[in-house]
């Protein structure tokens, strides 16, 4: 006989759906700049979840010496054939280096040359030892004031009324528990949508894609179903690869 479904009610000021790199850093930022309560809901565990769950060997968006944020905007605009929001790109590019320096303070190992400068890899990248990127970020989140984490809870729908969002509902993937979360503000940080197309690699390698297969597009669906305004859906990035190459990123 199965146990009856338990329903838990939670109230918070800010609900962050998704505990990947973006969700965790958002929680850190809010905690540092306010006294509001924050709840991070993650369907896996924030220590190893999201695009950087397994780590990364470079910061692939950085303004190296001699370059400006606008240079990155120009590069990304050309790469996407002009189908971009330049304002969003510039806002992000202006924060690249500050966030990178912050991650170094949290313990991220960034390779440096004999002069103590970051080792650049091209015009927009620097080399790192980033296998522990996510654990470092998770540790910082757990130490932050007024931040709670719900691991292994999958959020499925937003709660809306009169065109406004006031929370979300979801369920535990480990226990027979449903969650009703009320929040004054909701931030969706669930990543993109992987697996839309047939995998490039066969068998056990089919998960070697640009984004983790667990990025299901759930955040997009929640927004669309709730009437949220969506943007930049006109452009779909596809990483180009050389024939017979098995790699998670592009090779061209």
What residue ranges belong to the model's regions?
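N-terminal Rossmann-like FAD-binding beta1-loop-alpha1 element of flavoenzymes
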Residues: 14-40
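Short, well-ordered coil/turn residues at beta-beta hairpins
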Residues: 18, 183-185, 189-190
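Generic start-of-chain signal for non-secretory N-termini
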Residues: 1-13, 21
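Conserved N-terminal/central alpha/beta ligand/cofactor-binding core
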Residues: 3-6, 36-37, 43-166, 170-172, ...
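Acidic, metal-coordinating catalytic segment for phosphate/diphosphate chemistry
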Residues: 223
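A short acidic, glycine-rich active-site loop
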Residues: 206-215
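Core beta-strand elements of the Rossmann-like FAD/NAD(P) dinucleotide-binding domain
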Residues: 9-12, 175-185
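Extended, hydrophobic alpha-helical segments in both membrane/secreted and soluble proteins
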Residues: 186, 215-219
């Amino acid at each position: 006989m199965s146990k009856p479904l338990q329903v838990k009610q939670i109230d918070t000021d800010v609900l962050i759906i998704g505990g990947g790199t973006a969700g965790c850093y958002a929680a850190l930022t809010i905690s540092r700049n306010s006294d509001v309560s924050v709840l991070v809901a993650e369907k896996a565990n924030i220590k190893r979840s999201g695009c950087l769950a397994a780590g990364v060997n470079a910061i692939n968006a950085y303004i190296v010496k001699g370059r400006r944020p606008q240079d990155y905007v120009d590069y990304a605009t050309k790469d996407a054939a002009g189908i971009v929001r330049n304002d969003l790109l510039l806002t992000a590019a202006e924060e690249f280096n500050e966030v990178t320096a912050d991650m170094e303070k949290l313990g991220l190992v960034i390779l440096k040359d004999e002069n103590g400068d970051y080792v650049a890899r091209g015009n927009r990248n620097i080399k790192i030892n980033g296998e522990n990127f996510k654990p470092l970020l998770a540790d910082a989140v757990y130490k932050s004031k007024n931040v709670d984490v719900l691991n292994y809870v999958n959020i499925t729908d937003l709660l809306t009324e009169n065109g406004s969002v006031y929370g979300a509902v979801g369920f535990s993937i480990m226990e027979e528990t449903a969650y009703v979360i009320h929040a004054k503000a909701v931030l969706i940080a669930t990543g993109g949508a992987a697996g839309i197309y047939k995998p490039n690699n066969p068998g056990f390698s089919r998960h070697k894609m640009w984004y983790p297969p667990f990025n299901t597009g759930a955040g997009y669906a929640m927004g669309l179903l709730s009437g949220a305004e969506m943007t930049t859906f006109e452009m779909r990035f596809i990483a180009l690869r050389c024939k017979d190459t098995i790699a998670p990123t592009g090779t061209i």
